[in-house]
């Protein structure tokens, strides 16, 4: 073994679950090359910072993290590499902003990062955008007993506020065979919940199979032994097919839950965003065919040209009660995005005020929905169990809650529960977006 192989590496993943999965693949690649893996920065000889730059806040977080690690580098022998969206966005500017970084890898070169660390290639390593695909070996992170499955890379849409196509390239689906093999390995390792992700999950397969075939993929995955739940995030409204809706009806392993980012409900704003104008109608159709499904969405407040009338139209649509959860974000103006050139930008203070209005409206809807199931029995996945005095404080999630964004199930119990197991309890009350239960 060379000195490089004996060294310890830590990978820091910033941003969304898609970056988490890529970091897991990176760790797998490094481990196969003989590196020791550690989450302890004090023990690391090499640190890889896997960055996000989708919005201003993500870009700022990435830059702050880089500076923090570079401060550590001043005090110890440490090599630092930056990968992902920030190098893809800034390219050669990275070496000017951060001259002490040892190397950079854009989104299309992640699989070659170990070569850069080994010194086979020196300096910047920026190539066309893309991402890791068809790789089965991962070092799973703290998401156990749940795991994300990235089914595609890139994006084929032209949303005016988004720079993902420039950062991630065109839409590329992974093959069904590679996904089935990976999920079988995940299930064998003890994973109970599988969460499908991509920039657009419902666009899956069109590029390689000639049609949207997410429904067929879900059927294959639902046959894998060991899995209890299969969850779908990042569904693009206009790609949701009748076949997909039927699969949700027929297969119990598929959670009756779907994340569909609509971004807005006003046609004026949707048009400026270059999003599907028939989005409200699509949501109505889904709820008509799947009345019990729990829907989550994402909304942008303060988009250029948005008026108070548009906001009222959005809130009126939300008040129909189609969504149980909504992530609301103030518009982030990136100079690289088409929307930055639009007229009538909304003042930051007004955007913040609108965000709060939308959040309050949605929370009232959430409370009303939970009130309707008080004292009903629900099943949840146990994620932690800590003893506090004579009581066990237990946290988990139901089939209608995604990790980190939809709150938790909270149970105080006199007996411990097994992490990774499932338990049934009755709904008592809400605390924020957490749901308190009792046995």
Curated annotation (Swiss-Prot):
Location(s) in or outside the cell: Cytoplasm
SUPFAM superfamilies: Radical SAM enzymes
GO cellular component terms attached to this protein's record: cytosol
Repeat keyword on record: no
Enzyme class: transferase
Chief location: cytoplasm
GO MF term set: 4 iron, 4 sulfur cluster binding; aspartic acid methylthiotransferase activity; metal ion binding; protein methylthiotransferase activity
DNA-binding keyword on record: no
Residues annotated as binding [4Fe-4S] cluster 2: 155, 159, 162
Annotated positions binding [4Fe-4S] cluster 1: 16, 52, 85
All copies of domain MTTase N-terminal, residue ranges: 7-122
GO term, biological process aspect, one: tRNA modification
Cofactor section: [4Fe-4S] cluster
Domain named Radical SAM core: residues: 141-369
Catalytic activity: L-aspartate(89)-[ribosomal protein uS12]-hydrogen + (sulfur carrier)-SH + AH2 + 2 S-adenosyl-L-methionine = 3-methylsulfanyl-L-aspartate(89)-[ribosomal protein uS12]-hydrogen + (sulfur carrier)-H + 5'-deoxyadenosine + L-methionine + A + S-adenosyl-L-homocysteine + 2 H(+)
Record-stated family: Belongs to the methylthiotransferase family. RimO subfamily.
Protein name per its UniProtKB record: Ribosomal protein uS12 methylthiotransferase RimO
